[in-house]
Amino acid sequence: MVLAMLGALYPRAGLSLFLFYLILAGALLRPQPQRSQQSVPEEFSAPLELLQPLSGLVDDYGLRPKHPRPGGPRPLLSQAQQRKRDGPNMADYYYDVNL
C-alpha cells in the first residue's frame, strides 16, 4: 500500500523501493549454507569440579584473597600525618614575614 502511494506520487521512488524490496526478499529467502558441526571433543572438555579442594580461605571464584602487608613503622607517612594534624605553617605562605 505504501509502495502504491509512493508510486503514485513519485514514480521513480516507487520503482526504486520496489527494486529494494525485491533484492531484500531475494537475499532473505535464499537458503543459507549450513555450517559444519565443529564441536569440542569430549576428552578436551574441562572437569566441572576441581580434583583437589583448595585449602584455606577462598572466595567464590576459588581465589585466595591478598593479605595486607605486615604492619610496621612507616616513618614518612607518620610524619606527614603529624604535620597534617598540626595545621599549616603560615610562614610558608607569607613571604614578607621576615622583611
UniProtKB/Swiss-Prot annotation:
Gene Ontology terms: biological process: fusion of sperm to egg plasma membrane involved in single fertilization; gene expression; maintenance of protein localization in endoplasmic reticulum; protein N-linked glycosylation; protein stabilization; protein ubiquitination; protein-containing complex assembly; single fertilization
Main location: endoplasmic reticulum
Residues that span the membrane, as ranges: 10-29
Membrane topology note: Single-pass type II membrane protein
Any single Gene Ontology cellular-component annotation: membrane
InterPro entries documented for this protein: Frey
The keyword Membrane appears for this protein: yes
Effect of deleting the gene: Mutant males are normozoospermic infertile. Mutant males neither have significant differences in testis/body weight ratios nor testicular morphology. They do not show any alteration in basic sperm motility. Sperm from mutant males passes through the zona pellucida, but fails to bind to the oocyte membrane and accumulates in the perivitelline space. FREY1 and SPPL2C double knockout mice are normozoospermic infertile.
Positions of region (Disordered): 60-90
Keywords: Endoplasmic reticulum, Membrane, Transmembrane, Transmembrane helix
Tissue specificity note: Expressed in round spermatids (at protein level).
Domain of life: Eukaryota
Record note on quaternary structure: Interacts with SPPL2C (via active sites); the interaction stabilizes FREY1 protein and inhibits SPPL2C proteolytic activity. Interacts with IZUMO1; the interaction retains IZUMO1 at the endoplasmic reticulum membrane and coordinates IZUMO1 complex assembly.
Stated role: Key regulator for male fertility expressed transiently in round spermatids where it recruits IZUMO1 at the endoplasmic reticulum (ER) membrane and coordinates the oolemmal binding multimeric complex (IZUMO1 complex) assembly. Upon complete assembly of the IZUMO1 complex, its ER retention is released, facilitating IZUMO1 complex export to the acrosome. Through the interaction with SPPL2C, inhibits its intramembrane protease activity directly accessing the catalytic center of an I-CLiP.
Name under which the protein is recorded: Protein Frey
Lineage of the organism: Eukaryota, Metazoa, Chordata, Craniata, Vertebrata
